Regions:
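Low-complexity, Gly/Pro-rich coil/beta segments used as flexible assembly/activation regions
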Residues: 35-135
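Aliphatic-rich helix starts adjacent to a transmembrane/signal segment
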Residues: 1-45
Length: 135
C-alpha cells in the first residue's frame, strides 16, 4: 500500500463517518421537532375542547352565551421540559371566535398554538372548526 492509497482511504472513511454523524443529528432534530409538533397539537385540541364545552344557547328563555373570546384568554403552556428542567419549551395558545352567520347561527372557532423551535424558528399549529348553538 502506498501513501496515496492510505490518504485516499482515510478521506473516504472520514467522509463516511461525517455522513453518518450528520444523518444522526438530522434524525434527532427531526424527532424532537415532531414531538413538539404533537405536544402543540394536543394543547390546541385541549383548548378546542374547552370551547366546545362552553354553553351557547341563544334560543333559551334566558339566553346564555359563554362562547366568547373573552372567556378564552391567551394561555401559556409547557410543551417539553428537559430531564433536569433547565430547558423548557413553552407555547402560547390563542383562541379566536367569530360569528359566521346569524341565520342559522354559526361561529368559527380557531385555536393557534404558537411556539419556537430551538428559540429561533417560529411555528404555529392551528385548528379551526365551526359550531352551532347547543352542540
Amino acid at each position: 500500500m502506498t501513501l496515496v492509497e492510505v490518504v485516499i482511504s482515510l478521506a473516504i472513511t472520514g467522509l463516511t463517518v461525517a455522513g453518518i454523524v450528520t444523518g444522526y443529528i438530522f434524525c434527532l432534530t427531526t424527532t424532537v421537532k415532531d414531538g413538539l409538533y404533537m405536544a402543540a397539537n394536543a394543547s390546541a385540541l385541549a383548548r378546542l375542547e374547552e370551547t366546545r364545552s362552553a354553553i351557547w344557547a341563544p334560543d333559551r328563555a334566558e339566553p346564555l352565551d359563554q362562547l366568547t373570546a373573552a372567556n378564552f384568554p391567551d394561555k401559556v403552556v409547557t410543551l417539553d421540559k428537559s430531564g433536569d428542567g433547565s430547558v423548557i419549551t413553552s407555547a402560547t395558545v390563542r383562541t379566536d371566535i367569530a360569528q359566521l352567520s346569524l341565520s342559522p347561527p354559526v361561529r368559527r372557532i380557531r385555536v393557534d398554538c404558537i411556539w419556537k423551535f430551538k428559540g429561533v424558528e417560529l411555528v404555529t399549529n392551528s385548528i379551526e372548526t365551526c359550531r352551532a348553538p347547543d352542540q
